[in-house]
Amino acid sequence: MNIVITGASSGIGFETARILAKDRSHSILAVSRNRLVLEKLKPGEEGGNIHIFPFDIVNGNYENELIPFLTGRFNRVDCLVNNAGKLVSKPFEKLEDHDFDDIFNTNVKAVYRMIRALLPYLAENAHIVNIGSMGGVQGSVKFPGLSLYSASKGAVAILTECLAQEFIDRKIKVNCLALGSAQTNMLSEAFPGFKSPLSAAEMAEFVAFFALNGHQWFNGKVLPVALTTP
């Protein structure tokens, strides 16, 4: 399978790319702004089928930068994992307009832009996996300081449901994994001192499995994946 993963330079995205690359039948396009960290995916036995592409998913030129790189290596895309995300932890009264823009541009607009850019290249029966959060699930426990982050992930969940219906005729499946806690830098930023029962690598094991197989059973679903929240 040809798989595109955003936010692949750290945390769950990095580990998901590493896990998927262990199967040499897969080719991975790992996307992130940070080339130096992306380079860590290359060394070793699993590195030969990983293509790294430093790219700003918010401000980058998809048509002139990402797509030429993609089509030079893949003739189609079988799976897209929209993993890149941004978190700001602030009391509501201290938020500024740029916080809103930063969060929604990364967590929502970039997901929209990536799907729109890759749509002509998505294979029949391709799978789009949007990485959401339990904070974006209606009725879930909410936490002070995470209003913008949770709202942005709620938007991703609704976008997932809408696109699953729009893409039925194309036979493209779209699902959202609403993740609970995993030990990442983002979790430490939101909940200093909290220790998750799951490592980033352990959460990535499920994300990788679901990316490859989840569309056999699900379409347009927002699926909680959480031992704790946090």
What are the residue ranges of the model-derived segments?
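Conserved glycine-rich cofactor-binding loop
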Residues: 9-10
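Conserved glycine-rich Rossmann-like NAD(P)H-binding loop of the short-chain dehydrogenase/reductase
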Residues: 24-40
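Substrate-binding pocket helix/loop in short-chain dehydrogenase/reductase
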Residues: 91-92, 99-104
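Active-site helix of classical SDR
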Residues: 115, 152
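Alpha-helical segment proximal to the catalytic Tyr-Lys
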Residues: 120, 161-166
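Residue(s) in the substrate-gating loop at a strand-loop-helix junction
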Residues: 133
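C-terminal helical subdomain
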Residues: 169, 176-177, 192-230
